[in-house]
């Protein structure tokens, strides 16, 4: 019997952004009537590859074949015309429209006589497509009255109206209940039986082994391999995903740990943290690892007072503290560097100096309640030299600096407050290799001076290379903790996907 033709074949796909090669000669195959898992760590290139397939990005190189015929995907419309649809993690339904209006949005059926939208025909055809996926929702219902699982069914029905042959599902169960998840799996089975190729992106291992037939793995923007699900297990799949060693680029410094600085007990928040408990000592870097949506940033923002805790206690230097807002955290010596420095870490339209002293202006007030510009300038120049911020002068707009230097300015802003606990989220995201090493050296210096540091990172080599201890989160909970000498990428990934035995 001859070799079967895949529904989808992507060959030699590459994509670069300024300073970053996101995809390098990547290939992928998916077969009709099968569910293909697309796996990889955060930043492996999964989203970029799917955005190319669905027409959001244009590839730099490579070819795309559907049922053996080469197609050129020039945009979202041409992808849909080729039978490719993506259902994003963030659903794109419009709450103020009805079910049928959402299903046929942009593809409305008009009356031959009046030219108006034929509402009756929309409802009839919507009902037909919903029945095809075993869904009994009234086409006249407002989408605002539906739960997340039902809204997802609307997206799938919408894909069917476009004659989708390839449906990409990006983390489809993230916001679903167990019952809604089981319903989704039944719908996926119905789609599979129709000969549709499903590309399924998820970090939940149990789902991959339950509903997928094959797995394609990306690693660091490159093709890492593929396998039949029946031929692999958890360990083999994780090894495919992480398969790289720690490099000598991480200048770890072993420092004697001091007294207990921070203690968190049973901390929860409605944004997604569930009963987190941990400790942090002076002179220590605690790395927090986990997949996207695991609750790492939410934990940091709860400690920092940006999110309100629903339960739990926070103690500093052995004494309980109350943190109800960000200023409470800052006044207690806790500072947080956001993962999104341009949106939350700095004000792009202000200068380097203005950003640096923004949180510490009271220090420079004189007896006339105006700023002592001379004293302020002295501190700004000190930190520019101390942490090697490359800027022509303190008046330079921060938006004109490189990512690494922007990060240093934000770090200086908090160091001016002499914090006891520094939480730094994705410290080297979007930063070049040279600047990364400088950031690591800065963190080591702060650790050596007795600062207690929490470092959240999606870069596993970074977590392993810099941290003294590593805490792993999964679905809002702390799934485990590893000492530096026992941790490796596979042990972290097992905890990150909820395998803690």
From Swiss-Prot:
Extract the CDD domains matched here.
ABC_Carb_Monos_I, ABC_Carb_Monos_II
Protein location = Cell membrane
Q: Does the keyword Nucleotide-binding apply?
A: yes
Under SMART domains, the record lists: AAA
InterPro entries (alphabetical):
AAA+_ATPase, ABC_carbohydrate_import_ATPase, ABC_transporter-like_ATP-bd, ABC_transporter-like_CS, P-loop_NTPase
Asked if the record carries the keyword Transport, the reply is: yes
SUPFAM superfamilies reported for this sequence? P-loop containing nucleoside triphosphate hydrolases
Classification via Gene3D superfamilies: P-loop containing nucleotide triphosphate hydrolases
What membrane topology was assigned to this protein in its record? Answer: Peripheral membrane protein
Quaternary state and interactors: The complex is composed of an ATP-binding protein (RbsA), two transmembrane proteins (RbsC) and a solute-binding protein (RbsB).
The entry assigns this protein to a family as follows: Belongs to the ABC transporter superfamily. Ribose importer (TC 3.A.1.2.1) family.
Mind telling me what this protein is named?
Answer: Ribose import ATP-binding protein RbsA
Give the species.
Answer: Clostridium perfringens (strain ATCC 13124 / DSM 756 / JCM 1290 / NCIMB 6125 / NCTC 8237 / Type A)
Gene transcribed to yield this protein: rbsA
């Amino acid at each position: 019997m001859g070799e079967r033709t895949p529904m989808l074949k992507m060959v030699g796909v590459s994509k670069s952004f300024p300073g970053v090669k996101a995809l390098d000669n990547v290939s992928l195959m998916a077969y009709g009537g099968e569910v293909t898992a697309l796996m990889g760590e955060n930043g492996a290139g999964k989203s970029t590859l799917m955005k190319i397939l669905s027409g959001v990005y244009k590839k730099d190189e490579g070819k795309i074949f559907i049922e053996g015929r080469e197609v050129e995907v020039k945009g979202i419309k041409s992808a849909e015309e080729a039978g490719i649809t993506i259902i994003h993690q963030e659903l794109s339904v419009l709450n103020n429209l009805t079910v049928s209006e959402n299903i046929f949005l942009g593809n409305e059926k008009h009356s031959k006589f009046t030219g108006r939208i034929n509402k009756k025909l929309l409802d009839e055809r919507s009902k037909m497509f919903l029945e095809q996926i075993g869904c009994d929702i009234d086409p006249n219902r407002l989408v605002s009255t539906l739960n997340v699982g039902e809204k997802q069914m609307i997206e799938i029905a919408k894909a069917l109206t476009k004659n989708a042959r390839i449906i990409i599902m990006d983390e489809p169960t993230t916001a679903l209940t167990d019952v809604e998840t089981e319903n989704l799996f039944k719908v996926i089975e119905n789609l599979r039986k129709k000969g549709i190729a499903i590309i399924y992106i998820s970090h939940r291992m149990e789902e991959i082994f339950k509903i997928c037939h094959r797995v394609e793995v990306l690693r660091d923007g490159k093709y890492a391999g593929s396998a039949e699900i029946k031929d692999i297990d958890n360990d083999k799949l994780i090894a495919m995903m992480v398969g790289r060693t720690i490099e000598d680029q991480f200048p770890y410094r072993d420092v004697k740990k001091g007294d207990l600085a921070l203690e968190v007990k049973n901390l929860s928040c409605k944004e997604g943290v569930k009963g987190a408990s941990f400790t942090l000592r002076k002179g220590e870097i605690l790395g927090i690892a986990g997949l996207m949506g695991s609750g790492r940033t939410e934990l940091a923002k709860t400690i920092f007072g940006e999110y309100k805790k629903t339960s739990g206690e926070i103690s500093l230097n052995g004494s309980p503290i109350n943190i109800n807002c960000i200023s409470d955290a800052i006044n207690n010596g806790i500072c947080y560097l956001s993962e999104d420095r341009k949106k939350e870490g700095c004000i792009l339209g202000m200068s380097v100096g203005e950003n640096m002293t923004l949180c510490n202006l009271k220090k420079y007030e004189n007896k006339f309640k105006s700023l002592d510009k001379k004293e302020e300038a002295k501190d700004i120049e000190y930190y520019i030299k101390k942490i090697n911020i490359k800027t022509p002068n303190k008046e330079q707009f921060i938006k004109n600096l490189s990512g690494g230097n922007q990060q240093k300015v934000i770090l200086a802003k908090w160091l001016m407050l002499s914090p006891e606990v520094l939480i730094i989220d994705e410290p080297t995201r979007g930063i070049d290799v040279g600047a990364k090493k400088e950031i690591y050296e800065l963190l080591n210096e702060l650790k050596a001076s007795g600062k207690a540091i929490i470092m959240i990172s999606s870069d596993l080599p970074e977590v392993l290379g810099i941290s003294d201890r590593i805490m792993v989160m999964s679905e809002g909970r702390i799934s485990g903790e590893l000492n530096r000498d026992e941790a490796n990428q596979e042990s972290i990934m097992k905890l990150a996907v909820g395998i803690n035995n």
